[in-house]
Amino acid sequence: MDTTVSGVGVIDKSMAVIDALAQGPCSTGELVDRTGITRATVHRLASALEMHGLVRRSGDGRFALGYRFVSLARTIDGLEALCDAARPHLKTLSEQSGESAQLYVRDGDDRVCVDVAESAHGLRTIVAVGARLTLERGSAGRALMQPDAGLVTSVGEREPGVASVSAPILGQDGVALAAISVSGPIDRMSTAPAERFGPLVLDAARAVGNQLGSLTSSGLEGDDFDGHLAAG
């Protein structure tokens, strides 16, 4: 988690709450554990952020990042076009696979989830929009780092019991603009998830890449996302 301190207490604590929720939904008690902030303060901050749409309550009552981050993120150059192009393919990928599908872009040494299509299963992978994850662990991170590898898989690598398959979304010059991923419980994905889900992921990545062809010709490159995403 980012531990940057600005000296403005309420801002620093609010960002600590946001960074904690970027790891996934959590209860008030879990927020206290993740941030080190007192229970009363963390609940007050989360409730205030909820009023502004930056935090929401998930179906089970836990706090999660709010959907306002989606509209804020879309103001970043090129990201709105990326999400618009990818969204129908994310939805199709989730429906065809029965699992959750995610779209990631690179930001420095991290990857940031910028869109999701969640599985209808009760037991499913949940990655919040705005979640910041390391590039080093998980298939999507490696797909962004090594676009020439094509299809990348992960089994219990980032989170025990979870498997994923990812592929880079390439621009016209082979630059990785983003990565698209499908993930779910190993019990359904199996320990060789590429065998069943790989073709679906590759088809989705290629379809989005084809739609984004005009972006690279207008000056958008994969590194243009680097360093411009907020840590939501």
For the regions a protein language model found, what residue spans apply to each?
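Amphipathic alpha-helical effector-binding/dimerization core
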Residues: G61-A149
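A structural signal for short hydrophobic beta-strand segments in well-ordered beta-sheet cores
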Residues: V55-R56, L103-Y104, I169
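A short, hydrophobic, proline-anchored segment that marks a local hinge/packing element in signaling
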Residues: V165-D173
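N-terminal helix-turn-helix
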Residues: M1-L79, N210
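Juxtadomain coupling helices with adjacent low-complexity linkers
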Residues: A149-G161, A178-G232
